[in-house]
Amino acid sequence: MKPAVDEMFPEGAGPYVDLDEAGGSTGLLMDLAANEKAVHADFFNDFEDLFDDEDIQ
């Protein structure tokens, strides 16, 4: 017996949108652009060179 959806996700479906409800993939992309988060403004790119292999022993 497979678990029902409400057993797998007891807190609900969450912020996910069905592609049919969003008007297809184009509508989904427009929804994503409209709901841009402010997290990116506080994100600092302080990463060192991720592809620097000189320090590998």
Curated annotation (Swiss-Prot):
Which InterPro entries does UniProt cross-reference here? CSN9_metazoa
Query: Which named protein is this?
Result: COP9 signalosome complex subunit 9
Its annotated function is as follows: Component of the COP9 signalosome complex (CSN), a complex involved in various cellular and developmental processes. The CSN complex is an essential regulator of the ubiquitin (Ubl) conjugation pathway by mediating the deneddylation of the cullin subunits of SCF-type E3 ligase complexes, leading to decrease the Ubl ligase activity. May play a role in cell proliferation.
Under the heading Pfam families, the entry gives:
MYEOV2
Q: Which domain of life is it from?
A: Eukaryota
What GO terms fall under cellular component here?
chromatin; COP9 signalosome; cytoplasm; nucleoplasm; nucleus
Q: Name one GO biological process term.
A: cellular response to UV
Q: Where in the cell is it found?
A: Nucleus; Cytoplasm; Nucleus, Nucleoplasm
The disulfides recorded in the entry are: none
**Which family does the UniProt entry place this protein in?**
Belongs to the CSN9 family.
Keywords, A to Z, come to: Cytoplasm, Nucleus, Signalosome
Report if keyword Lyase is assigned: no
Q: Does the keyword Cytoplasm apply?
A: yes
Q: How does it assemble?
A: Component of the CSN complex, probably composed of cops1, cops2, cops3, cops4, cops5, cops6, cops7, cops8 and cops9.
Q: Which PANTHER family match?
A: COP9 SIGNALOSOME COMPLEX SUBUNIT 9 (PTHR28562)
Name the encoding gene, please: cops9
